[in-house]
Structure formats: structure tokens, C-alpha cells
């Protein structure tokens, strides 16, 4: 009391600038177990706020629960959450565990009402009960009404998304926050080994579902005057202007890049009422990383896949070399059907295969009696299935043996005992991956799911951010590829001359002018022997033929309308014209003109968004999956074009596709270095990030198409091989050139 009085006197006299305020907490009035913690929490509240309690003596309540309604003291970050999101109604997909579950928990502590949706009811019930108990301890009134659950929700199912929105509206009357957290890990295979249905499933569950829910909540959020949408992406989906290669998970990388690119390009359309952002966690110390329910953890799965793919790539390379040396496919597969490394070292076995088996047998095994079977067996049946698929997609298997003989060969293959891969090597590789990840983290540690959720809850409280991606893992020191590089210069004549007499494939539908410009340049400067134009419809071929006119060499162009049978069309082109020196892939459909009813009454519905993904992303995957198996080919992927006079919605969605596509290009560039075919892949962008830089008239449009043609020729001309220069061979792959 004297201290306080002296401080006030000194402030009045000018001897002290700031007032020192004093209180004392008397603890003798409380004997409960949590009394000291409660006193500490109240002390922190007094010290770190500007509150001035007139009473000098502050007595502890004899019963904390009766006095506060809380069964435990609240201090630290929990106290800082109180009221942060008070009254908000939240829909969280994938809310039964992991980051989604922790977001639900912390938002509920922050005062929000949450609807947690997921597939497994038992996990949802356990989490809900846990959150309710915590809310009761904090002192929330009727906490069981603040946390609702909805099970059997698969975000790949459109009807489940409709059900989720309806259930949230029924429970709370409104939706203030949408958190798109649910998703799948993907097929975890190299792109050439991915099945199209697996690719589509990943993109539908992780990306199309996000847009579908966004489309459903935007009108109601606009009407109520506020809203917040959060996409849970991943650092391996890249960041603004940057693509991060993620080998063996191209479908996942593309879906996560799409989630991020979506918010960057939708923000201007949903504001000012609605904020839309993404978070991009890096590796998180949690259930998915460690594994659960008998499923191996992420690092263990990646380690096993890396080691299996190393063997598969060795086998694939040996088969290609044996065929190049003159062996028949029947002879190679006939030798391999024993699946016995020892037997395959005999002189009558094709040399390339025999040399590989000698090398495998000589590898150190770490023990006299290895407990794994890869020392004696070439491959597992799943590996054999992938090898046959590679030969089939690489157009090395005649149509007659596509199914019957190939399937019989796989079924007749002796099955190696488990484990196939040395568990000690898997463990060592997993540790290597883990240490590599730790070394890339700025914090030199992986955050927990709670760490990520806590940072995100505070991020969501900022009302001045939209269209951005937040990295709650502290960021990664990762190899990165800039998404947009300007086109400067042209292909060197000595490189272009190496294309003389070769075959080029141009694949597309509606982009007749750019394709015609590229064809003219290939004929005039590349002096290619033939061009195969693969279109979806015959009308598109006619449009390209018209755009070409009587260009020099136009008679060296053949046209094929493949419809939706793209792979079969490429097979036919390969059979008729041989291995292409370069393949240029352009989208099979234009970008829609509308989005959220901003321009006109039309809007981009979820099925139309799904079609956009199919024609602009999956289309390129289907091309790349085959062409990456053509030894000697170069692959160029083209992002969509927005014609002069296009809408803002078209421009936004074209940039969305461009950014998302480069996640695939960058990843494929790394993966293809590991394949024996070593096909370089690059991307050419026709859409710029700034709309003011887009062509305004026909003359500027023609200039852009000329630049496009030169960019395509630059990427299509033969580049240096890895054995000549590892450095140059590497930096020329996975790039994106903007024209």
C-alpha cells in the first residue's frame, strides 16, 4: 500500500514517468491442489495486462470451481485463445484426428461451435468427448452443444459434401468458417506407375472437393456479410511463385499445389466479405508420420518405395538395353520368368540382364544368412505388374500380348518370401529421410499437430489477410524451382539441326493458332521429317489445318482425332511413325469464362471445375505417363491460354492451372532423371501473372504465339545428356518458361 502511494506521489511530482501498481495475492484462503497454479495464472494476468485492481489484498476463492466455473486454472496459450473466435460456426472436414482434430479442439476452446466431419465414427466420438471434457473443465456452458460430429463423410463423394453443409446449417444455423482439411495421401508411386483412376481419385478428394465446398458456402457467406475459408495444403505443394518437386507423390503434390493456387486466385472474387487463405505445413510429428492401425509411417513407406523403385528402375533399364542390343522381348521375359538371380547369371541369358544379376548378387548383404528375399529374387509381383505396365505404356509390347500372355507371365512368376527388401536397409533409409527433413527445417525440428493448429488458429484471427499461404511449420530449406522464367533468346542452331528428319507430336484441341505457329517453326527451322497432330475432334484438326494454310512442309503433317481415347491414339501414332523426338501437350478444352457469378449470371459449378481439372491437368498427366517411357523423347507441357478479351475469371483460372501444373512438371523432371529413359520435361506458359501484360489486339496475340513457338522449339531441341554434363542436364529440366 505504501509502495503504491509513493509511486503515485512521484508521478504527480514528475520524478517518475510511469505508475507502478501493486497488489498482493493471499493464498491461505484456498487449500485445493490447483491453488498454486490458479494463483500463478492470476499473477500472470495482472502482470501482462493493464488492469488496475483497486484492492491491494486479493484473496484466493475457497473453491475455484464454484467461483469461476472452471475445474482447472487457465493460463498460457489456452488463456490467450479465450474468446478469439467467439460465436463463430465452423465446418471442418477430416476432423477426427491430426491437424483437423486439433483445429476443432482449439477453435472450440476459442469460443467457436464446430462441426467435425470424417469417415470413422468411433474416432469422431472419442475426439468429441475429449473436447467436451476440456470445455467443461474450462467452464463453458453446455459444451456438448458446441461440438457436433458427422461420420461416414468421404470428401470424394459429392453427396457427402452436400450432407456436411446441410448438417452444419441445421446444427448452428450458419457457417462462418470452412476448413478444407480432409484428403488422401495419394497412390505413392512414380508418375509412370500411377494409374489414371488413382490420379483422379487424389485430385478429386483433395482438390475438387475443396472447390465444391467453397462453391456451396460462398453465397451464404456473402449474404451474411462475412466468412473465412481455409484450405489445408502442404509445403510440398510449393509456395507463391515456387514449385517444390515431390518425387513418388506427383498426384499429392499437384493436388496440394492446387489447393494453394486456388486461394491465391479466388481471393479477389470472394472478397471483401470473405477471407480465403491456405496453410502449408511441412512434415508434422503426428499420427500420419508415425503410422497407425498397422500402416507404416510416412518415412518407412517412402524408404521402402525408394528401395523397391531402385530395383524396378534397374530391371527396366536392363530390359531396354537388352532390346537395344538385339534381344527379343520374348527372350527377355522368358529369362526373367524364373525370377531367380542365380539362374539368370548363365551365359544364355541376354547380356544386360545377366550383368545386372551379377551386380545384384555381389551387393553386400550384411549377414551370412539374409532374412530378406531380394538377394535371390528379381522382383515381387507388384513390381512385375509395374514393369509390364511400363513396357506396355512405352509401346514395347505388341498388342497381341498386351493382356493374355502378360497377365499369365505375372501370375506364373515365383513369389518371393516376405520381406523382400532388407528391413535394416528400410530402417536406415527411413532414418536418412528423417534426418534430411530435419536438416531442411529452419527450426531443426518437426512441429506437432497441436503446434500447427495453434499457429493456424492465431493466423485465422487476423482480419486483414486474404489470398495468402501461411507456413506453420517454419518453412523448409528445400530445392526450389521458380515457376516463371521469361523467354530470352532462342534455341541454338546446332541443337535445332539435330531434329532434322525426326518426328514431332503436337497434342491439343482448341489452341489452333499456337499449335499452327509451333508446327511452322518445327518445319521451317527444325526441318523435322513429320508432325503428328493429335486432336480430340476432327473439327479441331481442320481448324489447325486452316491456320497453317499453305505453310512450307504442310504436307508432312498428319492428323488424328482420338476422342477420349488419348492413350490408344498415342499407341497408334507410335506404331505408324515411331518414337517422337518431341511431344508438345496442350489442353484439350478452354478455360470457362465464369466464376461465382461475378461476370454475368453464370458461375463455375463443381462438375465444371472437375472437367477443368480433367482437361488441363489430368490430360497432361496422361500424356506424360506414356511419353516419359519413350527413350530419346523430350516433353513440353503447355498451360492454358486466355485469348484477348477474356474475362477476369478465365485469367484467374488460367493462372491457377499454370501454378498447379508446374508442381507436376517440377516433380516429373526429378522423377524422369531416375528412369532409364531419362525424358526431360519442361513447361511453357501462355498466361502471364499480370493481366496488363496480356495481348490486347490481334498483332500482339500473333507476337505471343510466335514467342510460344520459339519457347517450344527451345524446350524440344535436344539437350545435353547427363553423362556429358550433370549440371546442365539437370538445370534444363522441370522448368517453366513464360512467353
How does the language model describe each region?
Residues 96-97, 510-512:
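Conserved glycine-rich cofactor-binding loop
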Residues 270-284, 331, 377, 387-388, ...:
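Conserved Rossmann-fold SDR core element
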Residues 230-258, 263-264, 268-271, 283-285, ...:
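Catalytic loop of short-chain dehydrogenase/reductase
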Residues 189-191, 198-200, 437, 594-610:
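Substrate-binding pocket helix/loop in short-chain dehydrogenase/reductase
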Residues 110-127, 527-543:
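Conserved glycine-rich Rossmann-like NAD(P)H-binding loop of the short-chain dehydrogenase/reductase
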